[in-house]
């Protein structure tokens, strides 16, 4: 006697027992086999020892050595009356006895299974009627209708091949479909109802969502189309809220800044015209006002810590807005900035094209028109603030920035806001994207880095000359 590994498997009723090499495993165990047992009695003896004697009537034995293909008994030896000891005793540790059995079913169970299959088929077709409408081959459509009706008519090989080909095409189209396909709501029956629900409650509760879902799925449109899931209607509300936030109006801080810019623009344009033509009228000295309007705690001296302070202040929304007062010319002359500033402005403006002078709109001195234009500029600056790179005009904007940098390399956040509004209200920015405070801050930061590089280069040259 010697041990042998035994695997018992069952084959489906629609499969052929003689053609199958594997099935559904029932047990995997070891059996002690007597050496005198013949090969043709091995399957019956082992099944009786394992308690599956009822399966021996429709059972078939296979011998598998290691991982090789299982072989039936008649392919191993021609003499089926030979003993197991002579055949497998020396290699019993490498041999597996695989027993395939086909369960015996009576006519009643077969009839019940066929009825269940027909019910499942009808339910699937009724659930998705588009399957039959998309069939182009009339022969395949007739065969499917015959099967659904429960007709026992036998099909020939041509009809079976046509049906199998259509099923393969259907599975291929399903595989190609995107797994994240978006459920399309009907624009005539469903979208108006969804919009109405969204206006009443943009963020409904789970109970409301389920109520909306049941109403949509019970509509006549969804009787012949796929039903909507809970996740799909949640995604619609999420996307609707996101789109409404994107189209939200400009906040009050930006509007207030735009109104302040409307007050600043007339004085700034008037100052430019009077500095060019020497008109003896009341004017507004912008540079002098920048020196007067400072924030407590800010620093005008160049220090490394200011970069972090100004970077943080750009991201903070401040409610305090600066005020501008127009003084008579005698008072301004007494506290005016250096004469080099006016000369530099005249030179920068004279070097530009005549379009700058023509672009200075004298009619903008009206308070109403200035406020309207500033509001439009503020709206456009909101959408253009996301630009990653912005070029300053080398003829009209860079000279002004250079002059501001000479006055204060580390401007406060209030000064940066004033600089931004002044640049955006120039004629050049009417046809180009508006500038943000971040752009001005980055320009000053890069300009300070450039000065530092120049100083380091000059020191290196001086050191080289000293050593030479």
UniProtKB/Swiss-Prot annotation:
Q: Which GO terms describe its biological process?
A: chromatin remodeling; embryo development ending in birth or egg hatching; mitochondrial unfolded protein response; regulation of innate immune response; regulation of transcription by RNA polymerase II
**What CDD domains does the record tag this protein with?**
homeodomain, SATB1_N
- Note the Pfam families from the entry: Homeodomain, ULD
Q: Which InterPro entries match?
A: HD, Homeodomain-like_sf, SATB1/SATB2, SATB_ULD_sf, ULD
* Protein's gene: dve-1
Q: How is it modified after translation?
A: Sumoylated at Lys-327; sumoylation is required for cytosolic localization. May be desumoylated by ulp-4.
Keyword Repeat on entry: yes
Species this protein is from: Caenorhabditis elegans
Q: Which GO terms describe its cellular component?
A: chromatin; cytosol; nucleus; transcription regulator complex
Its annotated compartments are: Nucleus; Cytoplasm, Cytosol
**Positions of the DNA-binding region:** 179-248, 385-458
Task: Cite the CMP domain residue spans from the record.
Answer: 1-103
Q: Where this protein primarily resides, as one coarse class?
A: nucleus
Question: Record keywords: Signal included?
Answer: no
Indicate the quaternary assembly. Answer: Interacts with ubiquitin-like protein ubl-5; the interaction occurs in a mitochondrial stress-dependent manner. Interacts with lin-40; probably associates with a NuRD (Nucleosome Remodeling and Deacetylase) complex via lin-40. Interacts with histone deacetylase hda-1.
Q: Give the phenotype of cells or organisms lacking this gene.
A: RNAi-mediated knockdown inhibits expression of hsp-60 when adults are exposed to conditions causing mitochondrial unfolded protein stress. Causes abnormal mitochondrial morphology. Drastically reduces the protein level of hda-1, possibly via ubiquitin-mediated degradation. Under conditions of mitochondrial stress, partially suppresses nuclear accumulation of lin-40 and lin-53.
Query: Which Gene3D superfamilies would you find in this protein's record?
Result: Homeodomain-like (1.10.10.60), SATB, ubiquitin-like oligomerisation domain (3.10.20.710)
What is an example of a GO molecular function annotated in this UniProt entry?
enzyme binding
As for what it does, the entry says: Transcription factor. Acts during mitochondrial stress by activating the mitochondrial unfolded protein response (mtUPR). Required during mitochondrial stress for the activation of genes involved in the mtUPR, in concert with histone deacetylase hda-1. In response to the citrate-induced mtUPR, positively regulates transcription of transcription factor nhr-80, thereby leading to modulation of lipid metabolism. May play a role in modulating the decline in protein homeostasis associated with normal aging. Required for embryonic development and maintenance of mitochondrial morphology.
Q: Where is this region: Disordered?
A: 295-314
- Locate the coiled-coil region(s) and give their ranges: none
Q: Which cysteines are joined by disulfide bonds?
A: none
Its recorded name reads Homeobox protein dve-1
Keywords (alphabetical) are: Cytoplasm, DNA-binding, Homeobox, Nucleus, Repeat, Ubl conjugation
């Amino acid at each position: 006697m010697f041990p042998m590994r035994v695997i018992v498997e069952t084959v489906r009723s629609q499969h052929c027992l003689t053609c199958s090499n594997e099935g559904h495993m029932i047990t995997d165990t070891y059996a002690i086999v007597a050496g005198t047992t013949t090969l043709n009695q091995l399957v019956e003896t082992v099944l009786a020892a394992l308690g599956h004697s009822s399966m021996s009537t429709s059972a078939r034995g296979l011998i598998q050595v290691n991982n090789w293909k299982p072989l039936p008994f008649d392919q191993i030896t021609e003499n089926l009356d030979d003993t197991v000891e002579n055949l497998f005793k020396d290699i019993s540790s490498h041999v597996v006895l695989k027993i395939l059995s086909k369960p015996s079913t009576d006519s009643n169970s077969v009839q019940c299974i066929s009825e269940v299959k027909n019910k499942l088929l009808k339910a699937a077709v009724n659930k998705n009627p588009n399957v039959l409408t998309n069939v182009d081959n009339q022969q395949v459509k007739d065969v499917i209708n015959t099967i659904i009706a429960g007709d026992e008519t036998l099909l020939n090989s041509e009809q079976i091949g046509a049906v199998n080909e259509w099923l393969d095409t259907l599975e291929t189209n399903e595989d190609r479909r995107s797994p994240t396909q978006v459920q399309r709501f009907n624009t005539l029956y469903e979208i108006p109802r969804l919009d109405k629900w969204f206006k009443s409650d943009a963020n409904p509760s789970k109970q409301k969502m389920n109520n909306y879902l049941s109403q949509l799925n019970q509509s006549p449109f969804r009787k012949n189309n796929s039903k909507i899931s809970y996740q799909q209607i949640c995604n619609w509300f999420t996307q609707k809220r996101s789109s409404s936030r994107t189209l939200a109006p400009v906040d009050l801080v930006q509007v207030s800044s735009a109104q302040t810019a409307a007050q600043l623009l007339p004085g700034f344009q008037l100052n430019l015209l009077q500095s060019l033509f020497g008109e003896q009228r009341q004017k507004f000295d912008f540079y002098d006002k920048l020196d007067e309007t400072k924030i407590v705690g800010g620093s005008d001296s160049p220090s490394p810590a200011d970069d972090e302070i100004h970077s943080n202040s750009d991201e903070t929304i401040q409610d305090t807005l600066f005020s501008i007062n127009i003084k008579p010319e005698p008072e301004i002359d007494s506290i005016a900035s250096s004469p080099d500033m006016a000369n530099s402005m005249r030179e920068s403006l004279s070097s530009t094209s005549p379009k700058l002078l023509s672009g200075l709109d004298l009619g903008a001195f009206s308070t109403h028109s200035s406020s309207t234009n500033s509001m439009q500029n503020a709206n456009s600056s909101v959408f253009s603030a996301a630009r990653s790179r912005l070029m300053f005009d080398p003829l009209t904007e860079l000279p002004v920035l250079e002059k501001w940098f000479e006055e204060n390399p580390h401007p406060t956040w209030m000064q940066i806001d004033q600089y931004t509004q002044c640049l955006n209200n120039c004629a050049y920015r009417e046809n180009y994207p508006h500038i943000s405070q971040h752009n001005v801050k980055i320009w000053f930061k890069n300009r300070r880095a450039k000065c530092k590089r120049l100083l380091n280069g000059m020191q290196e040259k001086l050191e080289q000359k000293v050593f030479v």
